[in-house]
């Protein structure tokens, strides 16, 4: 079962905030400009409100109409500056937010490319997709809507409090009490909401993973009539999402009404006491008018602070999930031996081929020694006492010793779970062995750069995966710098050229939906052509012909005979007919080798292979 991302109460919000601030810090100038413009906007609003005092007092004391006009004009100018500043920080924040989101998406995708296969084995595709959609979207909402408003609200709250004390320090003590009650309740609700926002993001990820999985497997679902079962599973997931969302939004929804209610009570009490102070001559009417407007307006930034804080909590929950993935350790590669395509120079020495041109020749050298010569790569692969387990403490392979000499075809047969595919995964170093040694031309594979090792191994995976693009693009995936001539040559080797020529646009025919517009056999032929264009010294066919009809299989076998010339080949197949001409057949059972020999030798032994061949055991 796929491992889910952590849905427990967040434990590292402090670290999440620090990493988030680091991303913001990459765009200091733009965010600094946002901060300045936000501060100007907030201060303009405060100053505009403060202007009520001199305007009202001026009218009462002098009755001067020109003075009134000047005061109103000055107030209007202050508010205009605030409006322009608001427009400026809004537009700047949009651009800054998109830059930050670009950085997060880029870093996340780039980091995923560096993670070991075991990371993807334990997680569903939909959960990973949710990181780029749901979680990034919550960050986007927070940056676009909340960042500047939080700054503005903070400045307005602090500025309002300062001006209130300037206008009337006695009444301001009551305001402080009201603020204290507000912030206590906000903190209480925030702490509760934070837990449920994290649960909500986790539920969204699980839901997207489930939908993606069911959409990909609809044919199987319908074959076995599991529509109702799937619906019940979906309803359980959306019930979890509903529960988490209701709790998160429920606590959040109480904050604004609570703040408004407290501010109204505060306002009423202060209005009564302020009126008494004016009647007793302890305050001017202008001061009270300005003071009451400040008190009334103070609820707005607090409400904004509360509301945007909710968006920020959701964003931090999403950011924590993203940053947890970014904290995953990348695939380690300490290899110094490089493998390169080579060609022979005029004097017969090996030199790297120009532009990686296909030459059929490969060589290796230790990059740690600049003077090291290029040594021809022959394709000799050996396992010595190799043990391995996908899960610590559980052994999948034990004490496996085998060899494949250059140019040999080695076939693996055995029942499901015997360890056939695991062996090919270890050759590729998709996983590292627990004990023992795997050598490639006498070099421990752990000393070879993984990228070079995999480049020298042509692989046809058990499940053919095609990408959106043309037929030529999918073949070129095996060698990104392959020329059109190399693409066609590879297709001919795989016997795919004839069917490609019959497609509507030939090699430019678009492939979409993982090759849904192609037959199983055609997809398999393209996968083999993809391996052929790589021109590798070692070829791995993981059940490459298991889903192909007899006629297509015959075409592939003819092409593969040409492709295998001079190469070391490992084959895993369902059909024993595909391994008859192997130099050696290795029979695996329960993670160990039980027999090795040629087809005739193994039949003569009348052991496991004999029983498989005669249909007494199921081959998988």
Tell where the protein language model's regions lie, with residue ranges.
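Hydrophobic alpha-helical transmembrane segments of ABC transporter permease domains
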Residues: 36, 44, 48, 73, ...
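Transmembrane helix-loop-helix hairpins at lipid-water interfaces of multipass membrane proteins
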Residues: 31-88, 92, 165-170, 268, ...
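Membrane-integrated ABC transporters
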Residues: 1-44, 60-74, 89-93, 97, ...
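Juxtamembrane loop-to-helix connectors within ABC transporter transmembrane domains
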Residues: 16, 24, 56, 89, ...
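An intracellular "coupling" helix at the cytosolic face of ABC transporter transmembrane type-1 domains
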Residues: 26, 117-118, 136-143, 147, ...
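Short intracellular "coupling" helices and adjacent cytoplasmic loop segments at the cytosolic face
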Residues: 2-8, 98, 106-136, 209-233, ...
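ABC-type nucleotide-binding domain
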Residues: 342-620
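Helix-loop-helix
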Residues: 61-66, 70, 163-177, 247-320, ...
